[in-house]
Amino acid sequence: MSSLEREKASVFHSWSAQSTISPLMVASAEGVWVTLEDGTRLLDFSSQLVNTNIGHQHPAVVSAIQEQAGVLTTIAPQHGYQSRYRAAELILDRSFDGAAKVFFTNGGTEAVEHAVRMARLHTGRPKVLSTYRSYHGATATSINLTGDHRRWANDTASAGVVHFFGPFLYRSAFYATTEAQECERALAHPEATIAFEGPSTIAAIILETVPGTAGI
């Protein structure tokens, strides 16, 4: 069997009809370049999942991973460790005013789940607002928060999520023809949504400041 055949036979790919996929078989990557198993070099315009923004195999990142792996590879959350609090301090230095602590998770979707739980716990309110054409993850609550069609198969409509239209002048939901019109109408829409849903029922609004998977 070829590498591609073995990949398709053993790996379940997310967001894909398994019988129709034909993934590129990557051998290595460096900087902005990805090299396939057949030697083809491709310029990685998508930065993988829009996350390798300093390039592949950055020497400083590789060195730090190697150094840490030689000392400690995992630690239970009930323990303290220097690398973790140093990372937290760096994040807090660059975060918003008033940020006091960092809660580490395994990824973005888990971060969203915890953020929603915290918002509901501290407000006592059930609803969270999110925009259409958004992506917030693929676990229970985060996939309901996601605002594109990929959520449909798993959207139970019972997660206390309310969607609204965000600004999108290219295909405006508000029939706007200028940026000023789009901004004004896009701000009025969630305001009306909040009023009709009941302000006292809303725990949080989740937004992508820069649309990623469902926008770029």
What is each of the regions a protein language model found here?
Residues 36-37:
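Short, acidic, Ser/Thr-enriched surface-loop or helix-capping motifs
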Residues 13-17, 45-59, 145, 213-214:
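Glycine-rich phosphate/pyrophosphate-binding beta-alpha loops
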Residues 40-41, 216:
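Residue-level signal for well-ordered, solvent-exposed loop/turn and beta-edge residues enriched
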